[in-house]
């Protein structure tokens, strides 16, 4: 139902993302059925906000020029009440990076935050103790309580990626048990997750459901790719193949999650 809708609608997903994984994000978006636009030129942001279904922001290789484009774009998408996904990469690592991410979080209508547990901990007011882009934080009951409080206070969905993924709203939490350890052996897996959230949010009004379906789809594609891969190189290629061949029946049959 959801993937079929994506392939029928072909939503335009505007990315302002990092230059390490921009190609992965574009190919993953195309594979699942969307049309990515990778545009960070500040003078274009208003025009793209009018034609695109969703905005995905990733601060992995942030600099002042790109940050200003993100602010401009987030302003226009927010004014149009269109979904905005933020991946605050390495939040908590440096003061300059934190300042940019916190401005995005505090000044604009971010719909979905996709990050690892350390980054989300920094978002919700816990000490994330981030180490680069690696996750060093364990999700526990206190973390989940604080995350739900944040989601309620800011009307946002939190997507916590890890060995177990969490989708957190003000009212409910989903735990996803699908996935592959191979996703940690390549660059871009987390960035592609944010892209998937953007794709699904571009066609699904309920952002909790959009985030849940996005992460299930990506995690299941990772499982399918691992089954036929010999290492990280073939896994990367097979992941794009798996996303392009994935359908709603695959997700229904293989989904392993619970709502708590």
From Swiss-Prot:
Transmembrane spans: none
GO biological process, one term: thiamine biosynthetic process
Catalytic activity: 5-(2-hydroxyethyl)-4-methylthiazole + ATP = 4-methyl-5-(2-phosphooxyethyl)-thiazole + ADP + H(+)
Entry keyword annotation includes Nuclease: no
GO MF annotations, alphabetized: ATP binding; hydroxyethylthiazole kinase activity; magnesium ion binding
Keyword terms of this UniProt record: ATP-binding, Kinase, Magnesium, Metal-binding, Nucleotide-binding, Thiamine biosynthesis, Transferase
Positions bound to substrate: 38, 188
Top-level EC class: transferase
This enzyme's EC code(s): 2.7.1.50
Pathway where this protein functions: Cofactor biosynthesis; thiamine diphosphate biosynthesis; 4-methyl-5-(2-phosphoethyl)-thiazole from 5-(2-hydroxyethyl)-4-methylthiazole: step 1/1
Names of the cofactor(s): Mg(2+)
Any single Pfam family the record assigns to this protein: HK
Nucleotide-binding is among the record's keywords: yes
Residues involved in ATP binding: 114, 161
Superkingdom assignment: Bacteria
Alphabetized HAMAP family for the sequence: Thz_kinase
Family classification: Belongs to the Thz kinase family.
Function noted in UniProt: Catalyzes the phosphorylation of the hydroxyl group of 4-methyl-5-beta-hydroxyethylthiazole (THZ).
Protein name per the record: Hydroxyethylthiazole kinase
Originating species: Campylobacter lari (strain RM2100 / D67 / ATCC BAA-1060)
Gene: thiM
